[in-house]
Amino acid sequence: MPRRREVAKRVILPDPKYADRVVAKLINIIMLDGKKSTAEKALYGAMEIAAGKAGEEPVKVLKKCLDNIKPMLEVKSRRVGGSTYQVPVEVRPERRVSLAMRWLVKYSNARSEKTVTDKLAGEILDAYNNRGSAVKKREDTHKMAEANRAFAHYRW
């Protein structure tokens, strides 16, 4: 238990265009070297492209895309008597969203399109349609948890 007072959680203000906290958080994850306006342009452009192809509202497309990426289970290493077990644990709701966002940005950057906007739009659309690298990452995480189900009683 920490002896100091608990640190207050920073409140993230909603983004200016869609007035949505999830979009604001994703902008912060995309941002490099403090260039927020560049990150905003990239994400807003990607959301418009994805929404145009999906035929829905940009925020709805993004939220459905993130829902398709969110992991329900993950594995954590637990050392028991000289050997390390991969113990499956349920993912906290805030961590689900943050992992989904990080995976979305990571795998969109690994894509072969030319601009960041196109890369993001492509990965958002793929995740929206339940395919793509970020969704594969979620499936792999779930498979890993399922494979180590025998160690679930080591949860803490």
Curated annotation (Swiss-Prot):
- Answer whether the UniProt record assigns the keyword tRNA-binding to this protein: yes
A cellular component term from Gene Ontology for this protein is: small ribosomal subunit
GO MF term list: rRNA binding; structural constituent of ribosome; tRNA binding
Q: Alphabetically list the UniProt keywords.
A: Ribonucleoprotein, Ribosomal protein, RNA-binding, rRNA-binding, tRNA-binding
Matching InterPro entries: Ribosomal_uS7, Ribosomal_uS7_bac/org-type, Ribosomal_uS7_dom, Ribosomal_uS7_dom_sf
One biological process term in Gene Ontology: translation
Concerning Pfam families, the annotation shows:
Ribosomal_S7
Similarity annotation? Belongs to the universal ribosomal protein uS7 family.
- Function comment: One of the primary rRNA binding proteins, it binds directly to 16S rRNA where it nucleates assembly of the head domain of the 30S subunit. Is located at the subunit interface close to the decoding center, probably blocks exit of the E-site tRNA.
Q: How does it assemble?
A: Part of the 30S ribosomal subunit. Contacts proteins S9 and S11.
> What protein name does the entry list?
Small ribosomal subunit protein uS7
Q: Which gene encodes it?
A: rpsG
